[in-house]
Regions:
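Acyl-donor-binding surface of acyltransferase catalytic domains
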Residues: 1-33
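Short amphipathic alpha-helix that is part of the acyltransferase structural core
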Residues: 22-56
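A conserved beta-strand-loop-helix scaffold within acyl/acetyltransferase catalytic domains
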Residues: 57-59, 68-75, 79-98, 102-106
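Conserved acetyl-CoA pyrophosphate-binding loop and the N-cap/start of the following alpha-helix
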Residues: 110, 114-122
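Conserved GNAT acetyl-CoA-binding A-motif
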Residues: 127-139
């Protein structure tokens, strides 16, 4: 049986509304310092395995380093205490004054706690500080069942 993958392209152009993070107690979202590409690769593999994230699985260490050290890329990490919970990556495109939400996800053991929407809200708030023309994301029917409604 062949099933079609539905793709969705979404954008935000109005950043005037304040976004409520609803960050639970003992959770924090930190901006990664780009020292360690292993963190991005870990999240990509662990979260992506359930959603058919495949394009970066064959990347070499040097490809990961080049990606993570891009001066316009930010990786934000959600933690509970010292435990890793989830992340998102966003890239600022200065030529078009846009922010692209590249990847976002929560580790399996933390799903069902509405932390994905917390990360989305944080990403919007973070992007808005750059005063972009728009923020955009694409998702598809292979992503988490709540991804589209969260965006």
């Amino acid at each position: 049986m062949v099933s079609r993958v539905k793709r969705y392209f979404l954008e935000i152009k109005d950043f005037s509304k304040t976004v409520d993070l609803n960050l639970p107690e003992n959770f924090q979202i930190i901006l990664d310092d780009k020292d360690n590409f292993h963190l991005n690769r870990f999240f990509y593999k662990q979260i992506g395995v359930d959603h058919y994230w495949r394009d970066r699985l064959l990347w070499s260490d040097s490809e990961w380093v080049k990606y993570v050290t891009n001066k316009n890329l930010e990786t934000h990490v959600l933690k509970k205490g010292e435990d890793l919970v989830g992340y998102y990556e966003q890239e600022y495109h200065p030529g078009s004054n846009e922010v692209e939400l590249i990847n976002l996800g929560v580790l399996k053991e933390f799903r069902g706690l509405k932390l994905g929407s917390t990360l989305v809200n944080h990403a919007i708030a973070s992007a808005s500080r750059k005063n972009p023309r728009r923020m955009w994301v694409h998702t598809c029917s292979l992503d988490h069942k709540h991804a589209l409604q969260n965006y």
